[in-house]
């Protein structure tokens, strides 16, 4: 038990913690020095009052420092969502990652099992024949050889074992629900990140700015998803050069049609993998257009495309040329190599 943490729990309930106070508090959590009651008390005090940018940044800083790091190629990007939107869509960010990698941009994707759908990124990749339970060294090999690597959160954040049981018992959202996209083990400086609430995109952009990100789009779909929506306008907070610009983005701005939300609702990992394979073969429809929209945004963030319409063209070529499909096959081979 940490006696030094106890007063901070009461403090957190009444005022924002300074960055130094918050870093100390999360150091206690990640070192296993806090009791389950102290962990729960701190997390709920923050949740009830509302976490600040400094508190998010402090937690992310400590979590990054304790993770198993990965070296990524220059210019690597992460394409990730917080999860937790409860919408059960097809695996859009996962498919987007392979399309972007097929366009020549290194993708260091951080992810986990299902949070907001029946099939999270790791579930879909496993169904596609990839081994996601690999360590940092193997991920580095994938990034260098294939230009894409998947970092399974539990394989890179061992300190989370101390707080996992408490999170499960609390059964409610805490600060940890948004830390995943802020704690990429490869330390990427560019990312396309979705949030389960529009109220999070500005604070998350401010956190990434404080942590040294160069360019990022934080997005929330108008259909309630943690990605750019193909059925409605989306909210965007774009970080570049330390400045944050907020705007609405409609699919038609990228030259794409609007589709009913129901057309991107997913199912089991096997069903989602089947849809993913069809997309890689060039099947048209709402799923492909949703992936093209998100891939276009990622290509803009990566400075691979000057605008969304050009990004859609590049992403379309990645699919139709077979480049995205080839990335899946190569990553499957590399992750299953003896």
UniProtKB/Swiss-Prot annotation:
It catalyses: N-(5-phospho-beta-D-ribosyl)anthranilate + diphosphate = 5-phospho-alpha-D-ribose 1-diphosphate + anthranilate. Catalyzes the transfer of the phosphoribosyl group of 5-phosphorylribose-1-pyrophosphate (PRPP) to anthranilate to yield N-(5'-phosphoribosyl)-anthranilate (PRA). Anthranilate 2 binds at residue 167. Pathway: Amino-acid biosynthesis; L-tryptophan biosynthesis; L-tryptophan from chorismate: step 2/5. Keywords: Amino-acid biosynthesis, Aromatic amino acid biosynthesis, Glycosyltransferase, Magnesium, Metal-binding, Transferase, Tryptophan biosynthesis. Homodimer. Binds 2 magnesium ions per monomer. Belongs to the anthranilate phosphoribosyltransferase family. Pfam families: Glycos_trans_3N, Glycos_transf_3. 5-phospho-alpha-D-ribose 1-diphosphate binds at residues 81, 84-85, 89, 91-94, 109-117, 121. Its cofactor is Mg(2+). Its EC number is 2.4.2.18. Anthranilate 1 binds at residues 81, 112. NCBIfam families: trpD. Mg(2+) 2 binds at residues 226-227. GO terms for biological process: L-tryptophan biosynthetic process. This is Anthranilate phosphoribosyltransferase. The lineage of its organism: Bacteria, Pseudomonadati, Pseudomonadota, Alphaproteobacteria, Rhodobacterales. GO terms for molecular function: anthranilate phosphoribosyltransferase activity; magnesium ion binding. InterPro entries: Anthranilate_Pribosyl_Tfrase (IPR005940), Glycosyl_Trfase_fam3 (IPR000312), Glycosyl_Trfase_fam3_N_dom (IPR017459), Glycosyl_Trfase_fam3_N_dom_sf (IPR036320), Nuc_phospho_transferase (IPR035902). Mg(2+) 1 binds at residues 93, 227. GO terms for cellular component: cytosol.
């Amino acid at each position: 038990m940490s006696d030094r943490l106890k007063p901070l729990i009461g403090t957190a309930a009444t005022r924002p913690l300074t960055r130094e106070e918050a870093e100390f508090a999360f150091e206690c959590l990640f070192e296993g020095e806090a009791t389950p009651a102290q962990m729960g008390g701190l997390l709920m005090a923050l949740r009830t009052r509302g976490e600040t940018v400094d508190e998010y940044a402090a937690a992310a800083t400590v979590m990054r420092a304790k993770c198993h790091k990965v070296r990524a190629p220059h210019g690597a990007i992460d394409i990730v969502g917080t999860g937790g939107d409860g919408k059960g869509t097809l695996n859009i960010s996962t498919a987007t990652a392979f399309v972007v990698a097929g366009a020549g941009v290194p993708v260091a994707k951080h992810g986990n099992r299902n949070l907001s759908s029946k099939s999270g990124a790791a579930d879909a990749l496993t169904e596609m024949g990839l081994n996601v339970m690999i360590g940092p060294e193997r991920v580095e090999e994938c990034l260098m050889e294939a230009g894409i690597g998947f970092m399974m959160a539990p394989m890179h954040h061992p300190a989370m074992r101390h707080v996992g049981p408490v999170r499960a018992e609390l059964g409610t959202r805490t600060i940890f629900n948004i830390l995943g996209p802020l704690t990429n083990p490869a330390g990427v400086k560019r990312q396309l990140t979705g949030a389960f609430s529009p109220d999070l995109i500005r604070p998350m952009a401010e956190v990434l700015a404080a942590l040294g990100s160069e360019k990022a789009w934080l997005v929330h779909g108008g259909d309630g998803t943690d990605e750019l929506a193909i059925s409605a306008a989306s909210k965007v907070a774009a970080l570049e050069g330390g400045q944050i610009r907020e705007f609405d983005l409609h699919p038609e701005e990228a030259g794409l049609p609007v589709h009913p939300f129901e057309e991107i609702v997913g199912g089991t990992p096997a069903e989602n993998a089947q849809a993913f394979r069809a997309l890689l073969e060039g099947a048209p429809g709402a799923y492909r257009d949703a992936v093209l929209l998100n891939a276009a945004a990622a290509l803009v963030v990566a400075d691979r495309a000057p605008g969304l319409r050009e990004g859609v063209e590049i992403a379309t070529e990645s699919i139709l040329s077979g480049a995205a499909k080839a990335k899946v096959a190569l990553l499957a081979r590399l992750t299953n190599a003896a």
